[in-house]
Design a protein with these regions (language model features):
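Bacterial N-terminal signal peptides
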Residues: 7-16
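Short amphipathic alpha-helical "recognition" segments used for binding
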Residues: 6-7, 101
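Positively charged n-region of N-terminal signal peptides that target proteins for export
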Residues: 1-4
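Noncatalytic, solvent-exposed loop/strand surfaces
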Residues: 20-414
């Protein structure tokens, strides 16, 4: 326990060293989909507190990232996978075409689903086409790799796993039937540092995963948490060796239990959504080998999320279910602090919720953002229509909210 407290203190110091306004990866700097401090807007009204709107070139679903005064995202442009940069005043700074686009199949998918990730020096982007690219902050390509050599993309839908950064490497997970890999690349050169196969026998589609890995610490060592193929595993970031694994998520061997929503970490517990939104479990981190029987703290079959990933804020886990129910649970016990719901609608929630200060922002696929104050329970504040479909997650930055729609990028102030 003392070792985990020390690790958490080190992580906190590292995060505080980052620019306060940075959102350097899909779910933010600590992969929780939240920022605890600040006062964020109670409404996202196009006629009242919209600061600017910038036109996007085509349909892309990646959540933008922010570093200081720059916004970075991916999108198709004239049939090409493209990385774009905007300033915080909405001006398009540059756009860099990377290679031929591989179009999305799902109505809420695209060839540009994964988010860019940055260490403040370089940008890294991955596309459904299999192209992995590193650029500088001026949009110049530093290196580029084609990952199609690691096997056919057998996912039924559109690749959505975002790359992440460890202290030394760029980490990519490819999780599909028959050719699943965990890969580490040198951040500077793009050379493969290590690669580990991650193939297991499962019922149909249960080895498909769209989840993004999480960087954690295992007994003082940097580790990568991977969720897919009915297994949660922790691997050394140094060489990919597996520290521990938890199984038993699908004892009845049901078909099509694909992983879409990602795991989150809260209070040294991994919160794992599974069973197509019907199950959720809490697993204590640590141990060695198979920890299935020793580290599972709780399991619930009355809550969960299928496509959206949970958020963690204020020591609690916030679950946005596909039909708009919102559950706030204790990560150590799995018990609900409260269970509420946004107003019902025919559309579902595909984007993940974001907690900024005391506000929870929930993007619905039809382009409506719903907001609740969760400081003390759940107080519904309103719903705000962007006028276009939204799949990306809201991004909080400097007490403003950045929204990426299918056609436009929006920034709202207080």
């Amino acid at each position: 326990m003392k070792k985990y407290l020390l690790i958490n203190l080190v992580l906190l110091l590292l995060f505080n060293c980052l620019h306060a306004d940075n959102w350097p990866a899909w779910r933010g700097e600590n992969a929780t989909g939240s920022t605890d401090s600040g006062t964020y807007p109670s409404e996202l009204n196009l006629n009242k507190n919209l600061l600017w709107k910038a036109v996007l070139p085509d349909k892309g679903c990646s959540t933008p990232i922010v570093w200081e005064n720059s916004i970075f995202l991916t999108s198709p442009l004239n049939g090409k996978d493209t990385v774009l940069s905007f300033s915080m005043d909405g001006e398009r700074k540059w756009q860099t075409p990377i290679g031929p686009e591989r179009k999305g199949k799902h109505r809420n998918g695209s060839g540009s689903n994964p988010s860019v990730v940055t260490n403040g020096k370089s940008l890294y982007a991955l596309f459904k086409s299999g192209i992995l690219v590193c650029l500088n902050f001026s949009g110049k390509i530093i290196w580029q790799k084609d990952l199609s050599g690691y096997g056919k993309d057998t996912l039924y839908w559109d690749f959505g796993t975002s790359p992440i950064l460890s202290s030394k490497h760029l980490i990519v997970a490819l999780m599909r039937k028959g050719n699943s890999w965990l890969l580490a690349f040198d951040q500077t050169t793009g050379e493969v540092v290590w690669k580990k196969e991650r193939n297991f026998q499962t019922p149909p589609e249960c080895d498909h995963s769209y989840a993004t890995p999480t960087l954690i610490n295992h007994d003082g060592r940097e580790a990568i948490l991977v969720w897919g193929a009915e297994r949660l595993s922790a691997h050394s970031s140094k060489d990919g060796e597996m520290f521990w694994v938890s199984t038993g998520f699908n004892p009845k061997q049901k078909k099509n239990w694909v992983v879409v929503g990602s795991q989150v970490v809260a209070a040294d517990v991994v919160i794992v959504p599974y069973g197509r939104g019907t199950h959720m479990t809490g697993i204590r981190m640590g141990g060695t080998g198979d920890i299935t029987e020793t580290h599972r703290l709780w399991t619930r079959t009355d809550t969960g999320c299928f496509v959206p990933s949970p958020s963690v804020a204020h020591g609690r886990v916030y679950i946005l279910r596909d039909r708009g129910e919102v559950h706030c649970i204790d990560p150590k016990t799995g018990r609900s602090h409260w269970e509420e719901a946004f107003p019902r609608a025919s559309s579902s929630y595909y984007g993940s919720p974001t907690v900024a200060g005391s506000k929870l922002y929930a993007p619905r696929e039809d382009g409506v953002i719903l907001i609740a104050d969760v400081a003390e329970g759940f107080t519904f504040l309103g719903e705000f229509d962007m006028g276009e479909r939204i799949i990306a997650s809201p991004v909080p930055v400097n007490e403003k909210i950045l929204i990426r729609g299918e056609e436009n990028l929006f920034l709202f102030g207080g």
